[in-house]
């Protein structure tokens, strides 16, 4: 019984293909607003100037299909010490769980009193997450608020990095600090892409907007060979 793994299937292959076809139609006929100048220039070269109107880019189906086929089918994720942890994609892939994410307050376990989230809370929560055997990763647990505001992401990410070895799902609140955080990790660890254990987490703006901060952070992560999570969550009425 310990080997029983439930499987939840929400859509048939035909329904998935239908959704994909409608998505391709929206991208080709409506397009996406791209706020990043560097990404906009790259897309102009790919789709042609006739498919770009100011910041609105219409993306042809064949380009999307090419991108899907070119993407790696599997990504091996490691821990900070270089030990393989799990593979994303492939026939044996399954749902993964991690602790998180980005609390502004910490509820004191002895008194239930909410207090501002501090470095010590990040340190303790990351250590707890690393001891939980059924959790595969540790996300950015909170936003530390006992340091200068412009250094929040630096201190929080440092505590996240040094207090655990599990794969790290990273959320950096200040888009201008993301590259600084990556450079800090490289100083501490070296090449981040050789055996990736950091998975940056991004939220573009719904619907059909690729905002500058998100796109530029994605570019920084991808150029380092890191897998990313793009959580383009749905919005009522969008």
Language-model features: locations:
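Acidic/polar, glycine-rich intrinsically disordered N-terminal extensions of enzymes
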Residues: 1-120
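Helix-rich catalytic cores of soluble enzyme domains
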Residues: 114-238
């Amino acid at each position: 019984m310990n080997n029983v793994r439930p499987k939840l299937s929400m859509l048939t292959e035909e329904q998935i293909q239908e959704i994909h076809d409608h998505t391709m139609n929206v991208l080709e006929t409506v397009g996406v607003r791209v706020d990043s100048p560097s990404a906009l220039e790259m897309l102009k070269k790919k789709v042609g100037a006739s498919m770009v109107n100011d910041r609105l880019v219409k993306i042809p189906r064949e380009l999307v299909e090419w991108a899907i086929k070119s993407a790696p089918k599997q990504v091996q994720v490691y821990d900070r010490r270089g030990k393989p942890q799990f593979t994303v994609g492939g026939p044996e892939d399954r749902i993964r769980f991690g602790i998180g994410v980005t609390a502004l307050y910490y509820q004191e376990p002895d008194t239930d009193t909410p207090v501002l989230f501090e470095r010590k809370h990040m340190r303790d929560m990351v250590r707890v997450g690393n001891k939980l055997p059924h959790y595969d990763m540790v996300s950015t647990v909170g936003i530390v608020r006992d340091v200068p505001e412009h250094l929040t992401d630096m201190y929080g990410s440092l505590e996240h990095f040094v207090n655990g070895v599990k794969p790290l799902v990273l959320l950096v609140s200040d888009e201008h600090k993301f590259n600084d955080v990556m450079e800090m990790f490289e100083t501490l660890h070296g090449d981040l892409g050789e055996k990736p254990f950091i998975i940056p987490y991004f939220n573009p703006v719904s619907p059909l907007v690729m905002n500058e901060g998100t796109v530029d952070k994605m570019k920084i992560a991808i150029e380092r060979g890191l897998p990313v999570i793009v959580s383009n969550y749905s919005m009522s009425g969008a």
